[in-house]
Amino acid sequence: KSSAASDVYKRQTVDDTTLIEQPFICDYGYNICFGRNFYANHNLVILDTTTVKFGDNVFIGPNCGFYTAGHPVDVKQRNSGLEYAKPITVGNNVWFGGNVIVLPGVTIGDNTIIGAGSVVTKDIPSNVIAVGNPCKVIKSI
């Protein structure tokens, strides 16, 4: 798990080292915490029904999504409007290739690369390269 989580949550600032290319879409905005030296390319979507925390030196390719909200598998519950939310935490020095999707409840460790087109459904440890759908570790770095 990332050491950045608690540090980033305390800051909750956007400073001169934060650059988000337009368009950028989020649900609320106030549930998002950016570390220093954050960069996101075009078409970033963050569905921040609950907290989304990014560490320092995070780079995000184009067309990426971070989704904290989900819906039940059970049809009756889903049709009743039930929704759940689980936080997403991204460590320090993480690079996301383009078209990556990160699903609710995921933690991504420090010094990690997530390959283009990946769908991250489970936690990814520190110091690895992970790719695919579902995203899996392919190499330690």
Placement of each model-derived feature along the sequence:
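Single conserved hydrophobic/aromatic residue that forms the stacking wall/gate
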Residues: 1-5, 9
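Flexible, glycine/small-residue-enriched loop-and-beta-strand segment within the central core
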Residues: 24-34, 39-107, 133-135, 140-141
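N-terminal active-site beta-alpha-beta segment that forms phosphate/nucleotide-binding
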Residues: 13, 17, 37
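A generic "structured core" feature
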Residues: 95, 113-115, 119, 127
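Acidic, glycine-centered active-site loop in nucleotide-sugar glycosyltransferases
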Residues: 125-126, 131-134
